């Protein structure tokens, strides 16, 4: 019964009233990206855009995007929940409501949002609900948090296009990706920033469906 209750708490979204309260103080994070030396929090050059993408464990997802041409800088953190300035330990309880996400700062003149969304949908399984592979809990849900109305509309169209591709491929499951405007992003602890650059042999749970996302 204890294990069932624990799993249920991890896979059920809390309400604002039941979520952990958190704290006023933000977590300490480095000023610059471990790989490319660019500022994690800005300021960023004019013309860049930002989107927040959740693909399960953020370690592998962040590496995927910092290696993508046109992505200027990345950072990992928590979004989509209620707890203020949550810690990693708090998010893993499922009692903050947050998802692990990657902040992707990109140059749309080099890589389009469609290009990023293609990577997003192809490189994880967006049909798994409150889990990603062996990682179970609300924090590992698939999510897209937009910073503009245009991003929001494109994300919804990309989801619909990929759902059609999954159906045609006989995948048989509905996309569960949460899509909405970003409300608040909280940076994760220093330890998690660019984790797989600091720990090259570390865990990466990214697994796609094998279905192509053909969006223009």
UniProtKB/Swiss-Prot annotation:
A single GO BP: protein modification process
Cited Gene3D superfamilies: Peptide methionine sulphoxide reductase MsrA
EC number: 1.8.4.11
UniProt keywords, alphabetically: Oxidoreductase
Family annotation (InterPro entries): Met_Sox_Rdtase_MsrA_dom (IPR002569), Met_Sox_Rdtase_MsrA_sf (IPR036509), MsrA_MetSO_reductase (IPR050162)
Coiled coil: none
Record field: catalytic activity: L-methionyl-[protein] + [thioredoxin]-disulfide + H2O = L-methionyl-(S)-S-oxide-[protein] + [thioredoxin]-dithiol; [thioredoxin]-disulfide + L-methionine + H2O = L-methionine (S)-S-oxide + [thioredoxin]-dithiol
Family as reported in the entry's similarity comment: Belongs to the MsrA Met sulfoxide reductase family.
Name the record gives this protein: Peptide methionine sulfoxide reductase MsrA
Native organism: Agrobacterium fabrum (strain C58 / ATCC 33970)
Native organism taxonomy: Bacteria, Pseudomonadati, Pseudomonadota, Alphaproteobacteria, Hyphomicrobiales
């Amino acid at each position: 019964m204890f294990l069932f209750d624990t799993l249920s708490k991890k896979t059920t979204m809390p309400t604002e009233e039941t979520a952990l309260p958190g704290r006023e103080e933000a977590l300490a994070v480095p000023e610059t990206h471990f790989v490319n030396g660019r500022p994690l929090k800005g300021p960023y050059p004019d013309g860049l855009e930002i989107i927040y993408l959740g693909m399960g464990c953020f370690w592998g997802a962040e590496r995927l995007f910092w290696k993508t041409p046109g992505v200027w800088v990345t950072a990992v953190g928590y979004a989509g929940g209620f707890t203020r300035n949550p810690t990693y330990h708090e998010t893993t309880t499922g009692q903050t409501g947050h998802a692990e996400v990657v902040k992707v700062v990109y140059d749309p003149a080099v890589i389009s949002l469609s290009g990023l969304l293609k990577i997003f949908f192809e490189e994880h399984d967006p049909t798994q609900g409150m889990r990603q592979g062996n990682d179970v809990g609300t924090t590992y849900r698939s999510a897209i948090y937009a910073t503009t109305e245009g991003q929001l509309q494109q994300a919804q169209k990309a989801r619909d296009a990929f759902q059609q591709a999954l159906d045609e491929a006989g995948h048989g499951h509905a996309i569960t990706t949460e899509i909405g405007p970003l409300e608040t992003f909280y940076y994760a602890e220093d330890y998690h920033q660019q984790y797989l650059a600091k720990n090259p042999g570390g865990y990466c749970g990214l697994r796609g469906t094998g279905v192509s996302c053909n969006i223009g």
